[in-house]
Amino acid sequence: MGEKYDIIVLGAGPAGLTAGIYLSRARVKTLIVDSGTAGGQMVMSYNVANYPGVETTSGWNISQTMLRQAKTFGCKVMTQSPVTGMNLSGEDKWVEVEDEGKFHADAIIAATGGVPRELGMESEKRFMGTGISYCATCDGDFFTDKEIVAIGGGNSALEEAVGLTKYASKVTIVHEFNNFQAQPWIVEEARKNGKIHFLMAQDIIEFTGTDHLEKVIVASKETGERTVIPAEGCFIFIGYVPNTSVFKGILDMNEKGELVTDRQMNTSVPGVFAAGDLREKRFRQITTSVADGTIAALSAIDYLQQKADGSPV
């Protein structure tokens, strides 16, 4: 039998790290497992200006502070550690981690967040990693003094486009509608930036190039006229999809693939809780994920106490 923990948290984004902070501070033996780096989607943000009590900083900085807090209180954190199997039913729940084996726990918190939504085009797949990216923080520096495209019209798309002007010589924002879905002040900030240009009501037709991206071809929704945009990089910011495929057939989901929970973050399986962007909800912010992680941790502590007391759970 592998090492036993009180609670295993799947995911080291803001929800998972917050849960880890609360659990470990309560002397609950906790393991956090993540297939990537700590921070989740949060690390993709250049500037975070709306996190209460914190001056404008990067998502990376916030994630590292959260990670240090969790570890300081005694939480074990395993990153770059894909989960290869799990059993979430019954009293003995376990998670199998690549190259590490099985870890057992009395309760599980699912906090695997979301993954960037793709356009679903063959040419998009061809240039992933050779010009096409979904993370400005990760890859922006590679495009210093180059012309790039940013696809999307929401808050993240415009905020990240502004951030990319620190590196790129020109950023062309391509959006499928005539109006942005971003908040007005974010749109105004983008419009005031001399490096940013706009192409509205456009369909993405194709990405072209040889061994790396060279052009983005778009077409007007109104006239069908095509425009070829020279670009060595293209950042796609069209939202996220819940990272819940590993829970399919195990936990109840809605038609969007989001986990269904109650207010206490209980899922359809006793002893399994969910927190963050993978669950069914309207608003997704760092702060809402932190709130979810807090509630999930406290609910999980209640669950462990009820088990110890022999109360129904």
Locate the predicted segments by residue.
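FAD-binding core/adjacent interface of flavoenzyme oxidoreductases
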Residues: M1-L10, A26, L31, M44, ...
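Beta1-alpha1 glycine-rich phosphate/pyrophosphate-binding loop at the start
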Residues: Y5-C75, G152, L158-Q183, N254
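Short amphipathic alpha-helical segments
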Residues: G20-I21, M44, G120-S123, A161-G163, ...
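Short, glycine/serine-rich, charged loops/turns that create anion-binding
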Residues: T37, P116, N155, N178, ...
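A Rossmann-like FAD-binding core segment of flavoenzymes
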Residues: A70-V97, K102-A105, K166-R263, D302-V313
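Glycine/Thr-rich phosphate-binding loops of Rossmann-like dinucleotide-binding domains
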Residues: E118-L119, L158-E159, Q181, R226, ...
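FAD-site-proximal beta/loop scaffold in flavoenzymes
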Residues: G120, R126-F142, I238-T288, D292-I295, ...
